[in-house]
Amino acid sequence: MKKTFLLALLLTIVVGMQAQTGKKILVTYFSWSGGTKALAEEIRRQTNADIYRIEPLVPYTDDYQTLAYEISNKEKEENARPALKDTLVTLNDYDYIFVGCPVWWFDAPMIIHSFLECKDYNFAGKTVIPFCTFATASYDTLNDIINATPNSTHLEGLGIRGSQSYTNSSAVKNWLDRIDISDIVAGITNVEADSKGTDRAYNINGVRVASMDNAPSGIYIVNGQKTVIK
């Protein structure tokens, strides 16, 4: 009974903290070669966000030459809107939405415009944060995403060279710090038993835990979030 009361008290504190500072975050991305996916997953990891992959109904070819010099170039010239594979994500659940993609022909791929203009999605009132991966430069890609969401608030975007997208944790952290996203609570976190230590951790009895390293299985409140170690 005492444990139940203490857990309820801790969760009440969590809810109060989230009501004041908590925002739900979604990372959305389109990736062809995997570089943008790696960057998106790093953003998700550091923000504790949900993640959603944007995919075309008809998958793009794996052949770079065909994709670069025929398909993507033609889509841009025709201002095409490739059909989306699905529209399953519910944007109403989120306050901050990251939108990421590779740079194709100096701009965002047309599939990104399909996503941002989809009638099933409403970005009005959301905070949209663009990011991209590129071979030479980001060009107008970040602005493409901003211009396609005129009724949203926007924060500084991030462009990273594709070859560095797999080793970008420090660049992502510095960027998230600059735009004040790092401290936003995204929801309940499930962690594995090898979770690293955190600044504020309490067990179900309300006792401060010095370190989460090698912590036994159970329910904890870590940095204001309910955390389950399995």
Language model regions located:
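Glycine-rich phosphate/pyrophosphate-binding loop and the adjoining helix
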Residues: G157-V185
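Sec/Tat signal peptide C-region and signal peptidase I cleavage site
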Residues: V15-A19
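Residue-level detector of functionally pivotal "anchor" positions at catalytic/ligand-binding pockets or at interdomain
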Residues: D183-N205
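Positively charged n-region of N-terminal signal peptides that target proteins for export
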Residues: M1-T4, K230
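N-terminal beta1-alpha1-beta2 submodule of the flavodoxin-like/Rossmannoid cofactor-binding fold
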Residues: Q20-Y96, A108, D177
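C-terminal tail/sorting-segment detector
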Residues: I219-K230
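Helix-loop-strand module that forms the ligand-binding subsite of alpha/beta enzymes
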Residues: L67-S152
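Sec-dependent N-terminal signal peptides
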Residues: T4-V14
